[in-house]
Amino acid sequence: MQRGFNEVLSSLLFPCILLITLFFLSDSALSKDQGGQKKSIAENNTNTQNQTSPNSQQEPVKLKTITIEATEISAEPIQKLESRELRVHTGETLGKTLEREMGVSNLSYGPGVGQPVIRGMSGPRVRIMQNGIGAHDLSALSPDLAVAFETMLADSITVLRGPATLRYGGNAIGGMVDIKHQRIPEKIPLNGAAGRMDFRYDHNSSDKSGMIGLDIGRGNFAIHIDYFQRSSNNTRIPGAALDEAAIRQQFQVDPETNSSKVIQNSNANSQGGSAGLSMIGKHGHLGGSYHEMTRNYGIPPGVPGHTDGTRTSQEAIRIDMSQRRYDLDGLLKTYWPSLPKIKAKLSYIDYDHRDYDKGITDRSSSLTQFKNSVWESRLEMNHQRGSWLDGVFGMQWQNRNFSATGIETFTPSTNTDSLGFFLTETLFITDRLNLEVGARIEHQTTNPKSNEVRMAGISAPLPLPNTLNYLTYSLAASLNYEILPQTSLYLNWQHAQRAPDVQELFASGPHFATRSFELGRLNLNAEQTNHYELGLRFAGKHASFLANGYYKSIQDFIYLENQGFFFNFAPDPPRFQQTCANLRNCLPVFGYQANHANFWGYEAEITAHPRLSSPFSPRLTLFSDYVRGWFQNGALGDVPRLPPLRFGGEVGFQWMQWRGGLR
């Protein structure tokens, strides 16, 4: 396996080395080409100066800012937050930042988590990326784990659904979120330096946060540095923290503890920073960066999950995470019209977090550590054929080492390799009609690092396979027609496949942060999704409109199902049983299942923003979105954990540089 790993790594490093070589050769050739012109340019400058009065000076002229607005003809459901809109909506988590976007919800397992949910999909079906490379935290593993990124550092956040997601792998089957930042500078700052500061305060939880970023450039080099810090107290609420009636319904007993007016253990703090260096030329850039962050947050107490005689009555699970990230990024603009641009990325991410219970006196003995070390690289080559064809061919490779050690080792250590190739093409049939098509093939190999796993409550070890292989493919097509100026109608179709993640295959133990005992399935097949979508968009000078409807059918949809019994820690040895006599000793058992599921939903938004002659500009928005999922087997009912129907309105205004709103 190590030999195969080295071979794949070498083959993928070659494109990066090639890109670096071409970068230097291109700039070198450009310098030689410009060298012969320097003399004539200097002579022209001298002649110009001779025609100018010796006492005259060149004064800088300040030009009036001109804003150009245009609507791109595309069939992709894409949303982008940037500049002022991003600053206004930035929240303490990624899910909180994006929850106002159509079709996006916030999966909050407490204020410190906040994962994005796209059209009801989350976890391993939504790929979170930073500058086109996976975030590679463990947020896809469990809903109690936060995305390892501070939203204040983002320059833009893009949410993408539909056919274009096939460029990013099976884990983007439900959608993709790409966080852009200038950690690796792509241009020299104007006047040699630029910076940004952002300080925020939230009254409810006394959330105090701030960041500072600085870009400095000279000649062909630019550097970037930034730092952030965030701290919050427990969240205040108007009533009780726990729904005692719901606990009685599931466990048939009364809860032991509850809190009023505040959610206990919901405080959090985080800090981190990054530095990047880039060499920038007329034909692209080449740079690298380092980023590090730490985050400590609590999971609000619910039903107590376990006892060992040393814990207190008030459960307080906390998560202490850290991540170190190394990125290389290169862009080459070539001389060839048919191959105008080549991009290459290589990243290494080292992530770990520890779950611990503040109620245990000996904290060190209760620590459970999760580690996720990932190499990922991408190579993309843009190609064109005149004005009628534009496309991208690329490859993506990833190697992941995952491990969990401690009393909460509910998933064994594994190594996962994946290699994918993709091709997307846009055919401009007429000025008003275009067709986008794409295809991807990907091979994933998952290797447990042990041939067996021992599970609490079962005396005999469970055997594990040496290797699990999945070959998946995706196909997509999108048609976009501009029926009227600024108005387009689009139709999307996609067939996508996703290989099961490690926790879906190998889970076999307690997970105290989610108050559950999880069981995986080794015989899971790859998910297969067929997605259909019809939408209408209008973007005018004083108003905009978006409406779409979609339907998707997913074969072998993987989900966690309550098994109807409990895992009891009190007996020696622990055992599975049908009822729970003491909440402190029990965990409900959830098992991964696969069944055929169907989804349908819609998104609609209309905005009026008349531009008046005065500095005052009003804005009115009406919106609604909805998703429903159900299993084809009627006895199973609806798909669990879907966001509810949402509708509402927003009234806003802008006066000069001030803006406000009510939603």
Say what each PLM segment does.
Residues 153-156, 161, 166-247, 267-271, ...:
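Outer-membrane beta-barrel translocator/receptor signature
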Residues 203-231, 243-297, 322-334, 385-389, ...:
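Transmembrane beta-barrel wall of Gram-negative outer-membrane proteins
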Residues 391, 435, 544-546, 550-554, ...:
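Gram-negative outer-membrane beta-barrel transporters
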Residues 59-97, 115, 123:
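N-terminal periplasmic "start-of-domain" segments of outer-membrane beta-barrel proteins
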